[in-house]
């Protein structure tokens, strides 16, 4: 394949797999494409990496669990029933040369506005809903990139499936904090009917690596200071 040829030609030490169909795009694709990208490709790539002595870092999602209240531990059995969650679950790799990180991320996009933060920024000065009972334990893309750098440098042998998680926060509170940090002038209406709780427990990863996840205020301060590139795209 072209991917295998590219890997053979470049001879990387580490491959970070960022290929995948996100949940917001699932309605515009079919199940075959979702399974090919989210389920099959990670295992094909992991096999190439294992044979070539290349480390692979792969991303899974909190959506391998249903949004039922309760803390989800890495030892718990995933129970997703939707195409996205199932396709990502099937794509989790666990080889001696790979690490799968279950997490969720918020950050900027180069194109479009499907993600939570990009959507909120695109709504500047308008009224939006804030979901009090949608509980989130993801990370900013800024912070995740720093963790990946540390994993590459300080934990070259770490393999397996782990969960990265921040302190739980409601989508209402998260959007409110983003509104304050970026001065979006949003009017946020409290919405309480929708319920979704995919709280991940990241204790095992934090204890193993001594990598602590900052508070949301600290992550958002860092995020707010990194806007100039995206504002000029």
Could you tell me what each predicted segment is?
Residues 18-19, 56-62, 101-103:
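SDR active-site strand-loop-helix element
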Residues 43-79:
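Conserved Rossmann-fold NAD(P)-dependent oxidoreductase catalytic core, especially the SDR/UDP-sugar
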Residues 81, 93-136, 140-150:
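NAD(P)-dependent short-chain dehydrogenase/reductase
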């Amino acid at each position: 394949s072209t991917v295998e040829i590219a890997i053979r030609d470049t001879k990387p030490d580490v491959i970070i797999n960022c290929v995948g169909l996100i949940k917001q795009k699932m309605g515009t694709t079919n199940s075959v494409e979702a399974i090919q990208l989210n389920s099959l490709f990670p295992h094909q790539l992991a096999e190439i990496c294992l044979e070539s002595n290349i480390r692979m870092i792969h991303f899974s999602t909190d959506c391998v669990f249903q949004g039922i209240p309760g803390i989800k531990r890495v030892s718990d059995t995933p129970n997703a029933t939707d195409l996205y969650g199932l396709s990502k679950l099937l794509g989790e790799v666990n080889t001696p040369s790979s690490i799968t990180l279950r997490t969720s991320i918020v950050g900027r996009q180069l194109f479009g506005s499907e993600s939570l933060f990009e959507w909120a920024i695109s709504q500047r000065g308008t009224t939006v809903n804030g979901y009090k009972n949608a509980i989130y334990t993801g990370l900013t893309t800024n912070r995740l990139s720093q963790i990946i750098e540390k994993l590459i440098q300080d934990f070259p042998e770490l393999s397996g499936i782990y969960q990265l998680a921040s302190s739980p926060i409601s989508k209402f509170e998260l959007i409110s904090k983003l509104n304050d940090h970026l001065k979006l002038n949003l009017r946020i209406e409290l919405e309480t009917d929708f319920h979704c709780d995919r709280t991940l427990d990241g204790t095992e990863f934090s204890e193993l690596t001594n990598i602590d996840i900052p508070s949301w205020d600290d992550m958002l301060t860092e995020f707010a200071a990194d806007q100039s590139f995206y504002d000029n795209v």
